[in-house]
Amino acid sequence: MEQSEGVNWTVIILTCQYKDSVQVFQRELEVRQRREQIPAGTMLLAVEDPQTRVGSGGATLNALLVAAEHLSARAGFTVVTSDVLHSAWILILHMGRDFPFDDCGRAFTCLPVENPQAPVEALVCNLDCLLDIMTHRLGPGSPPGVWVCSTDMLLSVPPNPGISWDGFRGARVIAFPGSLAYALNHGVYLTDSQGLVLDIYYQGTKAEIQRCVGPDGLVPLVSGVVFFSVETAEHLLATHVSPPLDACTYMGLDSGAQPVQLSLFFDILLCMARNMSRENFLAGRPPELGQGDMDVASYLKGARAQLWRELRDQPLTMVYVPDGGYSYMTTDATEFLHRLTMPGVAVAQIVHSQVEEPQLLEATCSVVSCLLEGPVHLGPRSVLQHCHLRGPIRIGAGCFVSGLDTAHSEALHGLELHDVILQGHHVRLHGSLSRVFTLAGRLDSWERQGAGMYLNMSWNEFFKKTGIRDWDLWDPDTPPSDRCLLTARLFPVLHPTRALGPQDVLWMLHPRKHRGEALRAWRASWRLSWEQLQPCVDRAATLDFRRDLFFCQALQKARHVLEARQDLCLRPLIRAAVGEGCSGPLLATLDKVAAGAEDPGVAARALACVADVLGCMAEGRGGLRSGPAANPEWIQPFSYLECGDLMRGVEALAQEREKWLTRPALLVRAARHYEGAEQILIRQAVMTARHFVSTQPVELPAPGQWVVTECPARVDFSGGWSDTPPIAYELGGAVLGLAVRVDGRRPIGAKARRIPEPELWLAVGPRQDEMTMRIVCRSLDDLRDYCQPHAPGALLKAAFICAGIVHLHSELPLLEQLLHSFNGGFELHTWSELPHGSGLGTSSILAGAALAALQRAAGRAVGTEALIHAVLHLEQVLTTGGGWQDQVSGLMPGIKVGRSRAQLPLKVEVEEITVPEGFVQKINDHLLLVYTGKTRLARNLLQDVLRNWYARLPVVVQNARRLVRQTEKCAEAFRQGNLPLLGQYLTSYWEQKKLMAPGCEPLAVQRMMDVLAPYAYGQSLAGAGGGGFLYLLTKEPRQKETLEAVLAKAEGLGNYSVHLVEVDPQGLSLQLLGHDTRLCGAGPSEVGTT
C-alpha cells in the first residue's frame, strides 16, 4: 500500500449500527493511529447511527453533525458552528450493514494482503485498504471539506489518479469502470461532457445503462466515495435542525423525532443531478427503502423537499478513475471466495500465518492469520481465516472456515468439507460469553427474497435428509415469504447438559452417521436464527480473539525466523506487540530462543531483539539507545555468558530485566545492557578466528635488541562493513583494499625488545620523543584494564595477553611469569603519524604491528594471515570489536580482496589482485587524500549498524549484499585497469556506506565533496565515514596543487589538508635492530606507573 505524504485528516469518523460496538471500533481506530496509519493529531470518533436503519444518508448527516460539534467544542464555541469546517479535512467511513462472512462487518474483513513497508506488522482489513486509498490516493490535493466513504466495497486505485481540483465547488463523486452486465445490479452515473452528473441509476434498464457508456466501452459505477466542499457540507449540516431531517441525527432522536431513512446517493446526491426535476425527485424513493405505507412516503417527501431547498443549487461532478477497480462485497459466497483467492500481484497464499505442512495447501486457496499444526489439507478456492487447527483435517474446494481453535479441531477429524461456510462466533447471551457455530452452503442465498436453499440444497431436500421439520425453524404464523436462511432457527446457542461445538451443526452434512442422536441434541438446544444471532455478537471478544491468534502465530514466526536464520525484519512485529500489549509474551519467546540456541549468532540476534523490544517500550523517551553497559547489577548475567553458560545467562538477564521496566530511562538502559550481552556472544563467535592463529619458534633476540615493525595505512575501495562481525560470518564479507603510503611514509609502527627487569614498559605516541605516554606494569593488576579501550595503553596490554606472554588468570604473579618464561620483561612502543579517527585503519593495523613485534621479540614468528586473525582476537579482547578489513589491507601488500564466508569459525582468505603493467603508477598519480579536519570514531556508527543488521532492516540487508557483489566487480575493474569505472564504483560505494550508516556524512564534508566532484572520477570518505580522510580518484594526474587551490577558494571548509598517496608494495615489514637502552628518550626512572 502507498505510504507517501497523504492527507492530514482533522477528523476521522467511523459510523456503526450497534451502540455496544462504539467503544470497540473507537479502540480499533486508536490502534491504527498508533500504527501510524492515521496522523497523530487526527481526532478519532466512532459514532453509532441514531437508529439501526437510518440509511447511508442519515448516517452521513449524523456523523457530520458530531464532527462539527466536536470541532466547535475544541475551538471554544458553546454551540455548533459550521465555521469550523472551513479549515477541516473530515473523513466519514460507514460500516454499513451486517455481513454474513464476518461478525465485524465488511470493514473488518481481512484480506489476503501483507504490507511489507508498514512500520507495524498487522492484519490488513478492508478498512485499512480504504484508509490508505483515501489518505494517499484519492484525498491528496483536495480542499478542506468532507470525504464520505462506504466500507462495503473493495477498491483499487492507481498511486496518482490525477484528480484536478482547480475551480471545484459543490460535491464530487468518484466512479470506477464496470461492465454493462455488472452495472445491471449496481448504481451508475450519467454525466455530460464536462463531468456534471445528470442522473444516477440503480439497477437501471439496459437502455438507461447504455446511455452511461463511456469511450472505453465501460460505465462509471457508483463507488461509495463522495466529497463535499465546505460550502455544500454547510448546506447539508443546516438541515439537521429542521424536521423531518432532524430525525436523522442523535439530537433529533433525543428530542423524540420519528426516525427517517435517508440514502446518501439516491436522496442527498440525486437532488443535485442536473436532469432531476423537483416533481420526480419528491415522488421518488431510494431503492433500499422498498415499498412501505403512505405515512412513510409522506414523511420521506418532506425530507426530500428540504434537501431540494438546501442542495439543489450545488453542482455535482464526477471523477472517473479509468485504471481503478470497484467490487461490491455481496452476500454471494462464491463471489466472496473468488475475491479472496483470486491470484494477483499483492495477494499471498499464506498471510500472517504459520503452516507446518504448506505443501498440503492447493494453489488457489488462501490462509490468513492462522496456525495450522500437522496435516491440514486445504482445497482450491477455499479460505481459512482466524483459525488455530491441529490436523489431520481435510477441507475441500469452495469452503470458508473462520474462528475455530484447537479445541474445535477434533470435530473436523474424519470429515471432508466441500462448498460450506463454517464459522465460530463469540456471542453474549444474558451477560455470559459463549461460542456459537454456524454452517451454511456456498450456494445458499442470504437475501430474504433469495432462492429457498440451505447447505446447497432445497429446503425440502434438507428436511428429508436431516429429519428437521419446518416448524423446528419457523413459527407457524411466519409467512412463506419470510421463511429463509436469515430467519431459520438453525444454530444451537445453549445445550442443557454440555458445551456446544462445531459438531452441533456439522452433523447436518452427514446425518445418517449419527443415527438420530445429533438431531435429538439439536432439538434439545436453544437455537437462534442468523438475524437473532447478530445483535448478540460480542465484537470486542471477536477482535480480541483475532488479536490473540495473530500474536500467537506472530510469536511462532519470530521464533522460526531467528532459529532458521532468515533475513526477515522483526521490527514491525516488535512494534505491533509493544503497541498492543503483547510485549511480555514476545520477551518470553525471545528468551527461549536465546537460551536454547546452539549457534551464538542466533542467540545474539535474539538478545538484540530483546533490546529492540525494550527500546520500543520506552516510546522514544529515556535517552539515546547507544550508551554504557557496565552497571554492576548486570555483572552476574554477563559473567554466565562470558563462561559460556548461555541458559543461565539468559535466565539471569531476564530476572534482572524485570527490575528495569518501570520507566523509559530504565528501559533504555536495560536495552543497552542487552546489547552488551549480545556483544559478548559476538566476541565468542569472533574468537573462533583463533583456530587460524599459529606461530613458529625462532631464535630469541638478544636482550635489548629491538624488533621493529612498520606498516602502511589502508584505503578501502569496496565492501566495507561486510567485514564487520556478525555480518562477516552471517552474510559473508568481501572487501577490496589498498595498502598505501601517505606523503611517501609508512605511518604506523611498533617496536619491542626484552629487558632485564621483570616488568612491562609501554609507550604510546609519535615515533619521536615528544608527547609520548609512558606506562610501567609491575603486577597483573596493572593490566586488568586491558578491556577498557580508553584506558591508557589498553591496546598494548591486550597485545601482551593475546600474544600469550602474560596469563592474567594465572596464580603466578607477573614477575614470576616473566622471569620463568623470558628471564626478564618487555618494552613495547607503538606509534601512528595519522590523526585520531582518520578512517585509514590505524588502530587495527597498529594492533597487528604490535603483535608482530612482540611475538618476534618473544622468539616466535607469525605469518601475515595468522596475524590477521590474531588482530581479530585482540580487538575482541580489547572489546572494541571491529572487522578484518583494516589489517588485511594494511598488513598485506598492494591491492587485494579479503573474503570471509557465512560460517564459523571465522576465517579470512586474501587474494592479491594483479593489475596491468604501469597501472599502479597510474593509481599513484590519480589517488589523493584530503584530511577533512573532522573526526568520528567508527564505534559511534558501529552500534547503529549492528542494531539495524540484527533487526534485518531490508535496506541494510540488501545493501550489505550489494557491498559484497560490488567488491567482485571492483576487483575486475582493477584487473582491467579501468580508472573511470573504478571512480564510478567509488561513488556508489560512498552511497552504500551512507545507506549502511546514516549520519556518516557531516555537512562540511558534503560541501567539500561537492567542491571536489568536478575534478574526480569518484570519491568517498575512508572507513566508516563521519570524518577523517576523504580519498578521490582525480580525472587528471598529479592534481595536489590544483585541488589545494580549489579548496582554498571555497568557504567554511575548516582545517583541511591535501596529501599524496601511493600504493605500498611491501605491507608489514619487520626487522631486528641493534641495542638501545633508552625508552623513547626516557630512562626507566622517568617512566610512570599505572
Swiss-Prot record:
Any one biological process term the GO annotation gives: GDP-L-fucose salvage
EC category name: transferase
EC number: 2.7.1.52
GO cellular component, one term: cytosol
Gene3D superfamilies membership: 3.30.230.120
InterPro entries in UniProt: GDP_fucose_pyrophosphorylase, GHMP_Kinase-Related, GHMP_kinase_C_dom, GHMP_kinase_C_sf, GHMP_kinase_N_dom, Ribosomal_Su5_D2-typ_SF
Keywords: ATP-binding, Kinase, Nucleotide-binding, Transferase
Expression by tissue: Isoform 1: Expressed strongly in brain, ovary and testis, moderately in kidney and liver, and weakly in lung, spleen and heart. Isoform 2: Expressed very strongly in brain, strongly in ovary, testis and kidney, moderately in lung and liver, and weakly in heart and spleen.
Family: Belongs to the GHMP kinase family.
General function of this protein: Takes part in the salvage pathway for reutilization of fucose from the degradation of oligosaccharides.
Protein's name in the database: L-fucose kinase
Annotated gene: Fcsk
